[in-house]
C-alpha cells in the first residue's frame, strides 16, 4: 500500500503562480515603490498643468487676431474704390459658349 500517492498538502496544491501567495516586500522596498508611484503621478500632473497653461496663454495672446480686409464703414474712398473695381471687372468679362 505504500505505492499509492498520498494526498498533497494545501501548499503543494498551490503550484501555479496565480494561486501562490505573493512575496511580502521589505519595508524599504515598499517605501521605494510608493515614492516611485508618487513621483510618476507628480510628473504627469505637472505635465498636464503646463500644457493647459500653454494653451491658455496661446488662446489669450491670439484673442481677436482675426483680420478682415473689408473697409471700415464710413470711409468714402474705400467705397469709391470698390465701385470702380466692380466697374472695371464688368468691362473685361468674356463669355464662352
Swiss-Prot record:
This is Small cell adhesion glycoprotein. PANTHER family: SMALL CELL ADHESION GLYCOPROTEIN. It is found in: Cell membrane; Cytoplasmic vesicle membrane. One of its GO terms (cellular component) is cell junction. May play a role in epithelial cell-cell contacts. May play a role in tumor invasiveness and metastasis formation. Its main location: membrane. Residues 58-97 are cytoplasmic. It comes from Mus musculus (Mouse).
Amino acid at each position: 500500500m505504500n505505492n499509492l500517492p498520498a494526498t498533497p498538502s494545501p501548499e503543494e496544491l498551490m503550484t501555479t503562480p496565480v494561486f501562490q501567495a505573493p512575496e511580502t516586500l521589505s519595508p524599504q522596498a515598499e517605501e521605494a515603490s510608493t515614492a516611485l508611484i508618487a513621483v510618476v503621478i507628480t510628473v504627469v500632473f505637472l505635465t498636464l498643468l503646463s500644457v493647459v497653461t500653454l494653451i491658455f496663454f496661446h488662446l489669450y495672446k491670439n484673442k481677436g487676431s482675426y483680420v478682415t480686409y473689408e473697409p471700415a464703414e464710413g470711409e468714402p474712398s474705400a467705397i469709391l474704390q470698390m465701385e470702380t473695381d466692380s466697374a472695371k471687372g464688368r468691362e473685361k468679362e468674356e463669355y464662352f459658349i
